Swiss-Prot record:
Lineage per the UniProt record: Bacteria, Bacillati, Bacillota, Bacilli, Bacillales
One Gene Ontology term of the molecular function aspect: glutaminase activity
Top-rank taxon, per record: Bacteria
Listed GO biological process terms: glutamate biosynthetic process; glutamine catabolic process
Organism: Shouchella clausii (strain KSM-K16) (Alkalihalobacillus clausii)
Assigned keywords, A-Z: Hydrolase
Gene encoding the protein: glsA
Name of the molecule in the record: Glutaminase
Keyword Hydrolase tagged: yes
Enzyme class label: hydrolase
Catalytic reaction(s) noted: L-glutamine + H2O = L-glutamate + NH4(+)
Annotated binding of substrate, by residue: S65, N117, E162, N169, Y193, Y245, V263
Gene3D superfamilies, alphabetized: 1.10.1500.10, DD-peptidase/beta-lactamase superfamily (3.40.710.10)
UniProt family annotation: Belongs to the glutaminase family.
Pfam families per record: Glutaminase (PF04960)
Hydrolase is among the record's keywords: yes
Amino acid sequence: MLCRSNDELELLISQARAFAGQGEVAQYIPALAAAHKHELSVALYYPDGKGFMAGDTEENFTLQSISKVLSLALALIDQGEECVFTRVGKEPTGDPFNSIAKLETNKPSKPLNPMINAGALAVTHMIKGNTAGERFERLLDFIRCLTGNETITYNKEIAKSEFETAHLNRALVYFMKEHGVIDEDVEELMDLYTKQCAIEMNCIDLARVGCVLAMDGCDPDTGKQLLPIDVARICKTFMVTCGMYNASGEFAINVGIPAKSGVSGGIMGAVPKKCGIGICGPSLDEKGNSIAGIKLLEMMAKRYSLSMF
C-alpha cells in the first residue's frame, strides 16, 4: 500500500529533516551555496493523476544532474540507441561524477556512462538543432511536455554562475573533442549544458516526470505515450546503475528504485508501475546526494515496500 495521505508524508519529512544537519549545501557553484540546508520537500505522483506532497513542494529548484536523464531521453529519440552508445558507454564508474580519470585510461576514450559529467556533455552534444539556442529550446519544450507544465524555464543567475565556474567541465569537453567524441564549439556546448542544468521545477513537476518513467513513458493524466518504451527502460536502467553517483550500489540495496540525484538536492524516483517521486533537500552528503532526501527514501522504501529487488 503506497502513501495516500499528505499527513503521512509530513510525519516522514519531520523525521528525515533531522539528518540535514549532517551535510552541507553545494559550495562550488556560488548561486547554490545560498540554499537553506534544513529545507526538505517531497511529492508523489500516481498513474491515476493524483498526487500527495509535504514540505515546500511549490518551491522551485534547479535540476542539475537530474537533467542528464532527460537529455539522454531526447538524444535517444533524436539519434537512436546505436548512435548514442558509439559515443557514450553503458557501465557504472566508482569515480566522482566530474572525474577525468577514466577518460584518460580507457580505450577508446569515451565516457563510461551518460550520468557522469563527461557522458552527459557528450549526450547533450547529440541533441538535434541548428544552433545551441534551438537545441536548448527543444530540450525545454520536451521537459515541459513531460511535466505538463508550460511555464518551466531556467534560472539565468545559476546558469551564468555555472558557466563562469565550469573549468573542469570545459577540460572534459576539450579532452573529448581531441578524441573525436565531440566536434562542436566548446563554449556553445558549455552554454547549452549549463542552461540545461539550471532548468527549474518543483517537487510536483519532478514527481510527474518520475511517474512518466515509472509507467514506461506513458502520461499519467492523458494516457498518451510521451516516450518510447525502450527509451524509458534505458533511462531507468541507468538511474539504477549510475543515478546516485558513486553511491548507486548502496542506494539500490537500501532503497531499490530507479532514481537520479542532483547537487541542488533534488532526487527524482520512478517506482515501476506505481508512482513517481520528487524530493528536494539541499544538504548533501560526501557523495553529492541529498542526505535527508536519501533518509526519507529509505524510510519510504521500508514503509511502503518500494524496492524492486
